[in-house]
Amino acid sequence: QNEEQAYPQPKLLKANLRPYQHKGFEWMILLSKIQAGACLADDMGLGKTLQTISFLCHLFEADDAAKFLIVCPSSLIYNWKQELDKFAPHLSVYIHHGTGRNFEHFMQSDLQVCISGYATLRNDIEQFELPYWDAVVLDESHYIKNLHAKTTKAVYQLNSKSKIALSGTPILNNTFDLYSQMNFLLPDLLGGQEFFR
């Protein structure tokens, strides 16, 4: 730990964070400590996934019984698994997708990370809403830009200590796209829909 680093890189992380990635990692920790969610909206290729994995490693080093949920488009599920295996091999991963899903097994096991797709989360929300997650990560968080969509309503039912939204394009059409994502991270901070408009 030096003067420019509020938090050292996790010992369990199998990578060296670039200075800007370290700042993002520290930012997630600081927001988590004040119970505020974080939206990381870097361009593609700047390491949003690595910064997030660093944050999960930090939480795991503080509590090895922690449980994390990563929700992403189904096409990215195995990419997340590969990145976790590469950079955080100590974190055990359960993929909740397709046939043969067994969420109860995950909850009763020593596995730390559950990865699921948005559609599966929506269909199985009765299971996902029960735990109090140590962290919930939404990758491609613009998937919840529609405040009234079933997927968004399901995501809002999740309970967690820390919330992270990742997106290279948090605003696709207009600034209201951001409202639902920020309302997940910081409920009620932006006021009602009409006030925000």
Residue ranges and their predicted role:
Residues N2-R197:
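ASCE P-loop NTPase motor core, strongest for the SF2 helicase catalytic module
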